[in-house]
């Protein structure tokens, strides 16, 4: 089929690569403009742009999806299907109605659960044991289109958002290829979503990065996993942010002063939560790279009884 592919971050790259390998024709790959990134704020291309150019595909980077010149260019491309994977922009009704076969989207949850911008983060932070990917026919409402296919993926109890992200990106790419095979054969289903079961995954807020030690250890553990690798959960030590990237649950029924360091050992340091304790194994101090907690303790010694956070 003749496609227009819309996507931006790493999550969309396996899907683009899989569709190229499947032999589809690309009228264009549309992605967001280059952005300044890193400490030097160097202007860098989105991962999808780099992948598309390496494959010899034509790339468009509109700054305004409602620009008349862009919309006319899109119309002249005459795509049979628009495929959207983590594009990061809302498509107007005019765009949704443009391709002959419609627009399809790959979403990183088992819809109608976790509609919205941060489905993987939210699933891990909420302690879900299962997630998945969904392909759907796009509708004007947020992630509310009819479902085509779904594939489930377990969330291991120690898994991070980064690990689940990478796995879903690969699983989703395969599901998308299968979805397009069904569409090409005019056999793709349209399964309406049950609105009564819909839940939402809004963008992360800065205050959600703060560890509140008075919460149960399991809740904090899920927060640490859910915010790894980005943006990272943090506590305060001597007024400075200390990001925590790795931890293990210990002493699930232990109680005591929340935020108190109860033990410092070879693997890291143990902190008392509202209920239960956490052995912190990986941290990132200000201006430094992520490091084992044992290495951190060599440069920043810690003693039992120290209080972390704002509790």
Curated annotation (Swiss-Prot):
Underlying gene: fmt
Signal peptide segment: none
Catalytically driven reaction(s): L-methionyl-tRNA(fMet) + (6R)-10-formyltetrahydrofolate = N-formyl-L-methionyl-tRNA(fMet) + (6S)-5,6,7,8-tetrahydrofolate + H(+)
PANTHER family cross-referenced by the UniProt entry: METHIONYL-TRNA FORMYLTRANSFERASE, METHIONYL-TRNA FORMYLTRANSFERASE, MITOCHONDRIAL
Similarity section: Belongs to the Fmt family.
Residues where (6S)-5,6,7,8-tetrahydrofolate binds: 109-112
NCBIfam families for this protein: fmt
Protein name in the entry: Methionyl-tRNA formyltransferase
């Amino acid at each position: 089929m003749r496609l227009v592919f819309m996507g931006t971050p790493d999550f969309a790259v396996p899907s683009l690569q899989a569709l190229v390998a499947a032999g589809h024709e690309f009228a264009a790959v549309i992605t967001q403009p280059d952005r300044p990134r890193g400490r030097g704020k160097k202007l860098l291309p989105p991962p999808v742009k780099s992948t598309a150019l390496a494959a010899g595909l034509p790339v468009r980077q509109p700054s305004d999806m409602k620009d008349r010149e862009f919309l006319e260019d899109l119309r002249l491309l005459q795509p049979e299907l628009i495929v959207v994977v983590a594009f990061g922009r809302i498509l107007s009704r005019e765009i949704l109605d443009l391709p002959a076969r419609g627009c399809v989207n790959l979403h990183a949850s088992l819809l109608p659960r976790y509609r919205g911008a941060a489905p993987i983060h939210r699933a891990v932070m909420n302690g879900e044991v299962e997630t998945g990917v969904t392909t759907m026919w796009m509708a004007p409402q947020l992630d509310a289109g009819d479902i085509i296919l779904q594939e489930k993926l377990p969330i291991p109890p120690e898994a991070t958002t980064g690990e689940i992200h990478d796995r879903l990106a690969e699983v989703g790419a395969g599901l998308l290829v299968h979805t397009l095979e069904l569409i090409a054969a005019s056999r793709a289903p349209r399964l309406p979503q049950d609105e009564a079961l819909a839940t939402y995954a809004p963008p992360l807020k800065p205050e959600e990065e703060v560890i509140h030690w008075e919460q149960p250890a399991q809740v904090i553990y899920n927060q640490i996993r859910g915010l790894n690798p980005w943006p990272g959960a943090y506590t305060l030590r001597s007024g400075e942010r200390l990001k925590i990237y790795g931890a293990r649950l210990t002493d699930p029924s232990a109680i005591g002063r929340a935020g108190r360091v109860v033990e410092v050992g070879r693997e890291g340091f143990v902190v008392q939560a509202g209920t239960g304790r956490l052995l912190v194994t990986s941290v990132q101090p200000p201006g430094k790279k992520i490091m084992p907690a044992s290495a951190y303790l060599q440069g920043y010694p810690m003693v039992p009884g120290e209080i972390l956070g704002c509790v």
